[in-house]
Each structure stands twice: as structure tokens, then as C-alpha cells.
Regions:
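Extracytoplasmic ligand-binding site segments that recognize negatively charged/polar headgroups
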Residues: 124-137, 172-191, 234-236
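A short, structured surface patch at a secondary-structure boundary
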Residues: 37-94, 98-104, 201
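Short helices/loops that flank or line small-molecule/ion binding pockets
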Residues: 88-96, 115, 212-221
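Alpha-helical, coiled-coil/dimerization segments enriched in small aliphatic residues
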Residues: 65-70, 77, 183-210
Length: 286
């Protein structure tokens, strides 16, 4: 398993395990005029929202993942900004007036809270309505409600475009990544596929997903196989599963969608691009 793919897979499993119903968790803003001036992001999804919604002068630092183009769609915009380490000290030393953290950062958050910093938790989103709500909330938090509304409208327009291109009648789909791990129904990508006219295969574990066998995919498989971050060759055991010749033969380009997980882990601009990419990917399936 490559480093980048293992990071993407690990983040997806964490997203599943730490699903939160709300988009934002925080106390009221601590700054006087309602506009934070020194914002640090400690989270991949927060990076992308911050780069999209904040003024450059508001951004003090981003997370270590900010320049990883296998995970983020805003790497070019992230280049000018410093990045923190995976430790509370690197954040505290910057004296931010707002820290955007994720649900996975709780031990670090406890240290940031103890240091008196204002920390907002940016929750993972698992449906499109949450993504729109999150865009509005973060935009307002940063003092730019108009930008948050504009991003929410972009998300809505991308969803509408995908819905207009949806497969009819609906078909079954399984979302599989390295090693045969299949996404369950409680995921953002499943919500995206539902809009596209693709419903989960009954044989795939529900909820947050689980592993599916090669036999299931070949004998009782879906109409469409969605591969997340498919490797080009069988360089390791994880890649061997989804590059298997029988699987390739069963799911040719008319029955397969290849999609980068960077479009399916976060809301915001990543989701806008992901909805558009998925709409384009439906064309060969018709």
C-alpha cells in the first residue's frame, strides 16, 4: 500500500467512525467584532473551506495535509501559507484567535482548549444538505456570510446538474477501494451516487461498510462498480484485489466509475468538483 493511498483510506475509515450529525460545534466567537484575524486549520476539510471562504490575510497556517493533491483540491491556493505540525505546540505558538479542528483531533483539542484558544470543530459531512449548511456556517464564522452562501449555491447547482444526468432507471452500485473494502450507506459518496441514480448493492455491508469478497462482486455484483483511487498495477496486496483480471473483465468502462477519494471525503469545493466529475463519469454508462 502506498503512503498516499494508505492516508486516504485511513481518513475515510475515520470519517465513517466519527460521523457527526451537525456541521459545526463551538462556543460563541471570542473576538470582538465577529471576524477572526488569525485562523489556523488543523484539518484537511477545514483547509479547503478556509482557503475558499476566508481572506488570505486571515489565514495564519494550514494542516500538514494542505499540499497533498491526492487528498485536497485546493493545493495550489495553499502554497503561500505555512503548515502546522501534528502537535498542539505548533498551533499554540502561532497565537491564533480561531482554530478549525476535526473530530479526530480531540486529544490535541483538549490541549488547545487548556491553552485558552478558541477551537471550532468542523464535522465530517455525510450528505449534501449537511455540506450546504456547513458552507453557510463556516462562511458566517469567518465573517463572510456571502461567500458561504455562494459556496452553498454552488453545491446546490452541482447537485441539480448531477440529478438531471442521473441514470434511469436506477442501477445498483458498489463502492470499493484497495483490498476489497466497500463503503456502506452512511457515507458522503453514497449520497452522491444516490443523486446519480445509483443505489447501494444489498450484498455490500451496510452502515459504515466492510469488506466484500471477489466472489460477491463477480457472481452477485452490482450493475456499476465504483473504484476509489484505483492503482494502475498490482504493486502490493491491497492493489491486487481491484486490479484482478477477472474484475477488470467483468466491469469494463461501461460498468465502472473510477473516482479519486479527494472528491468524496469533504464538503466544500471538493464536493462541488466531485459532483461534477461524477456527472461526467455517467456518460459512458448510458
Amino acid at each position: 500500500m502506498t503512503m498516499k493511498t494508505s492516508v486516504a483510506a485511513r481518513l475515510r475509515w475515520i470519517v465513517a467512525g466519527l460521523f457527526a450529525a451537525g456541521s459545526l460545534m463551538a462556543a460563541p466567537p471570542a473576538w470582538a467584532d465577529g471576524t477572526p484575524r488569525r485562523v489556523v486549520s488543523f484539518n484537511l476539510c477545514a483547509d479547503q473551506l478556509l482557503l475558499t471562504l476566508a481572506d488570505p490575510a486571515q489565514i495564519t497556517a494550514l494542516s500538514p495535509y494542505a499540499l497533498d493533491d491526492s487528498l485536497s483540491v485546493t493545493t495550489r491556493a495553499a502554497v503561500p501559507f505555512p503548515r502546522v505540525g501534528w502537535d498542539a505546540e505548533s498551533v499554540i505558538n502561532l497565537s491564533p484567535d480561531l482554530v478549525l479542528a476535526g473530530p479526530t483531533d480531540r486529544p490535541t483539542r483538549a490541549m488547545l482548549d487548556a491553552a485558552g484558544l478558541h477551537v471550532v470543530e468542523v464535522a465530517f459531512v455525510t450528505d449534501l444538505a449537511q455540506a450546504q449548511r456547513q458552507a453557510r456556517e463556516i462562511g458566517t464564522l469567518l465573517g463572510h456570510p456571502g461567500r458561504g452562501e455562494a459556496l452553498a449555491q454552488q453545491l446546490e447547482q452541482a447537485e441539480t446538474g448531477l440529478a438531471a444526468a442521473a441514470l434511469k432507471p436506477p442501477r445498483t452500485a458498489a463502492i470499493v477501494q484497495r483490498g476489497g473494502y466497500a463503503e456502506g450507506s452512511a457515507s458522503l459518496i453514497t449520497a452522491m451516487l444516490t443523486v446519480a441514480g445509483l443505489r447501494p448493492l444489498a450484498a455490500v455491508p451496510g452502515g459504515f461498510g466492510g469488506f466484500v469478497s471477489m466472489e460477491t462482486l463477480l457472481v452477485d455484483g452490482p450493475d456499476v462498480l465504483v473504484l476509489l483511487d484505483p492503482p494502475r498495477d498490482a504493486a502490493d496486496q491491497g492493489a491486487l484485489f481491484i486490479t484482478h483480471p477477472a474484475l477488470r473483465a467483468r466491469y469494463d468502462e461501461r460498468h465502472r466509475i473510477d473516482l479519486s477519494s479527494r472528491y468524496t471525503m469533504c464538503g466544500g469545493p471538493a464536493l462541488v468538483q466531485g459532483l461534477d466529475r461524477l456527472r461526467e463519469a455517467l456518460t459512458p454508462l448510458r
